[in-house]
Each structure stands twice: as C-alpha cells, then as structure tokens.
Amino acid sequence: MKKVNHWINGKNVAGNDYFLTTNPATGEVLADVASGGEAEINQAVATAKEAFPKWANLPMKERARLMRRLGDLIDQNVPEIAAMETADTGLPIHQTKNVLIPRASHNFEFFAEVCQQMNGKTYPVDDKMLNYTLVQPVGVCALVSPWNVPFMTATWKVAPCLALGITAVLKMSELSPLTADRLGELALEAGIPAGVLNVVQGYGATAGDALVRHHDVRAVSFTGGTATGRNIMKNAGLKKYSMELGGKSPVLIFEDADIERALDAALFTIFSINGERCTAGSRIFIQQSIYPEFVKFAERANRVRVGDPTDPNTQVGALISQQHWEKVSGYIRLGIEEGATLLAGGPDKPSDLPAHLKGGNFLRPTVLADVDNRMRVAQEEIFGPVACLLPFKDEAEALRLANDVEYGLASYIWTQDVSKVLRLARGIEAGMVFVNTQFVRDLRHAFGGVKPRTGREGGGYSSKCSRK
C-alpha cells in the first residue's frame, strides 16, 4: 500500500501514527497517510524559520525562475496529478485534467511575474529628503488548505508565499492528502531549497491547531468552513491572517435576461466541481414573470451525467466522504420537509450505478423549487449539488433577499439593463459580482468576500497577509 509521509526540511519523514484515505467513488483504500501532531509541526516550523533568511534574501528573479520550473513540472505531470486528485476527491477527471491542475501550474507562473513588480512607495519630502517604504516578507506562514479542489487551492496559497520570499508549512485536509504530497516532492525536484516548503499531513484538531497556534508562525492563510475559521481567528493571537470561509451565493435572473444563457450558466455554477465549491450559485432568484420557465432548469439538471469520476463523460462525480454525503442528503430531506418542491434529483443514491460504484458517495443534481429564503436550505451552506429556486417580484426584493444571508462571497446578475447592474453591484453584499456570466477566474483581481470572509487573494492581494 502507498505510504504518504510528511515533507520536512527536504526529507520524506515517516509518521508515528497513520490513517487511511479512501476513494470516495469506490471505497478503495488509496494510501496510508501520516498523522502529524505537535512534534511534526514544531519540526516543520523550526525548519521553515531556519530557511527563511536565505530564501528571503535570494534575488527575486532567482525565486521566480525556481517557481516557473515548478510550474513546468506540474504541466509535465498533469495526467498523473489529475488522476490522483480524482481518486482522492471524486471530482470528474475532465475537470481535474483540463481545468484544475493546469490552473495550479498557472498560479506559479503568474505569481512569479506579479511579485517582481511589488515595490514600496517613495515620497519626496523636500529637495534633501525622501520617505520610502519597503515590502518585506513576514517570516513563516501557515497554509491550511481545504479538501475541495485541493491541489489548485494549495498552489494558490504556496505560490505568492514563495514569490515574496516567505517560507511555509502547508497542512492539507486529511480528506485529500495525496496531491499535496506530490506538490512537496515536485517543489524539491524544481530546486526549491529544503525547508522553504514543508508539508505536514494530519487532522485539523491536532496538526492544524498546533500549526496556527505556533509562536514562530507569523501569518495564517486558511480556506475552509466558517466554524473552523472562527476558531482559528480566536487562537491565532496577534498573527496576521486571511480567512476564506463559506459561501451561499445568489444568482439574480431578471425577466430581460438571456434565459438560455442564464440557464446554462446557473447549471454550471451550482453543479460543477460536484457542487463542492464556495462560489456555487446555490440560491437562484428568478423574477416571477419568468419563474415558470425555470422548469427547464430541472430538465437540464436531470440530464447532467453522474457516475464514475474517471470517465471523461462524467459531469458530477462522488462527494468527498460518506459523512459529507449524509450532510448533503440530509439537507435535501430537510428542504422537502420545510415545504420546498423537489423538481430533480433527491436525497438517495442513484439506482443505476454499476456494481463497483454502489458504495460510492453519489448524489444526483438536485433542484428544490418554491423555496422560502427563511428556510434552512436557503440560509445554510450545503456544499453539494443542490440548487434552491426562489421567486422575486422586483429589483428591490431581489436585493433584499440576496443580502438576507450570513455569507457574502460571490453573486451573479443576469439582466440587459446596465443601470440596474450598477445599482445592484453597489448594493449587493458580496465580494465579487459577475454579470451575465458564470464564475470566471482572473488572477489579477481580488478573490474574497464580505461578512465572515476576511481575506483577499489574487494579484497583489495575495501578499497582504504575508508581507509587512
């Protein structure tokens, strides 16, 4: 059986304890994974602290060269990494291979360039004096990364750190450890010096908690659940931190929208990446005059192909774990109990799966109609392939309903009225507003939200947590 250890100071370090990671589609055991704790974290942080001065003082062009080399190695190994990610997470292979892993490579290429352009500011005081600022790395950074799209998200955190001269300890979710292990290996192969990037496997309550509490960690970057994020903020002390937490993003579709395009984009926004994405458009608000037309949305949801994640034709694979499957399935049952109308999908596993997938964590794309915004399914993050359809009367009601939720990451507006777009973009409580399109990633712009989300990533924003 494959063993997954820690990467500390350039060495593959065995653990004292191990846990099994399994394929969510088949139940097959994939690897025996080291379960780190305080001892491994202390070792990794000490190593990162020791490596920091030399890495920080390495010329930026040399750091950029090593990062580009790492990006090239990822490109050369896309099929292998994508297959590993699909096996570990249940994500469809066409998404990991064609989108998510190539994006990870681009993260290194992008930040290698961006961070060479980061400079302080200079102000002439008079003809004899200048005031100037320096942009400097803070020291050791803790990177706590989630189980959904794990490789891409991990590289999104690692790349700006390396570019700025920061050393890091990466703690991946225990539900998706495999590709982080490969990242640690490829970083060394690319020539990243030992100790600059350390990867410690383990559980959040042990390895993760020890990492964010460590007195030599100067900054924490976390992506994950809101409850965990609040706990980290409480325990982080005076450290700088960036928190990318949950989402319950609204999609506002007005009667003057291009309905066919809106249907396709709304379908993609909620059901791609198995619905396990913080930017998922899970609350779809439809103007009353066109609400009956959205039976087409359920028809399209029923045509989404659910099945073997390794099949290139599969569009929705398996959810990350049995526990998460039970959570998402439970929300579907709850929505029906609360009075929503089930138009597609449902809380049970598909009955037409082949024998080797019968025990997998599969759910059909589910559409709940006639949802009231006060229902729990409309207020709480489900993090799965579940769309809630809600009617609205006019612009004012649409804005009120969209904002009436704890979360504020992304939002999506569909209308041909530019004035309406400008009003809504200003009034909607979301960090990102997409107009007449699904989520489109642009690394130059800030990624982040409002309300419980306190971080910004992308472009120069990614460095704000880890520079001084």
UniProtKB/Swiss-Prot annotation:
Top-level taxon of the source organism: Bacteria
Xref: InterPro entries: Ald_DH/histidinol_DH, Ald_DH_C, Ald_DH_CS_CYS, Ald_DH_CS_GLU, Ald_DH_N, Aldehyde_DH_dom, DH_HpaE
Keywords: Aromatic hydrocarbons catabolism, NAD, Oxidoreductase
pH dependence: Optimum pH is 7.5.
Active site: 244, 278
Reaction(s) the record says it catalyses: 2-hydroxy-5-carboxymethylmuconate semialdehyde + NAD(+) + H2O = (2E,4Z)-5-hydroxypenta-2,4-diene-1,2,5-tricarboxylate + NADH + 2 H(+)
Enzyme Commission number(s) from the entry: 1.2.1.60
Enzyme's top EC category: oxidoreductase
Functional pathway: Aromatic compound metabolism; 4-hydroxyphenylacetate degradation; pyruvate and succinate semialdehyde from 4-hydroxyphenylacetate: step 3/7
Example GO biological process: 4-hydroxyphenylacetate catabolic process
MF GO annotations: 5-carboxymethyl-2-hydroxymuconic-semialdehyde dehydrogenase activity
Membership in a protein family: Belongs to the aldehyde dehydrogenase family.
Subunit (UniProt): Homodimer.
Known role: Catalyzes the conversion of 5-carboxymethyl-2-hydroxy-muconic semialdehyde (CHMS) into 5-carboxymethyl-2-hydroxy-muconic acid (CHM or (2E,4Z)-5-hydroxypenta-2,4-diene-1,2,5-tricarboxylate). Is involved in a meta-cleavage pathway for the catabolism of 4-hydroxyphenylacetate (4-HPA) via homoprotocatechuate (HPC or 3,4-dihydroxyphenylacetate).
UniProt-recorded name of the protein: 5-carboxymethyl-2-hydroxymuconate semialdehyde dehydrogenase
Gene: hpcC
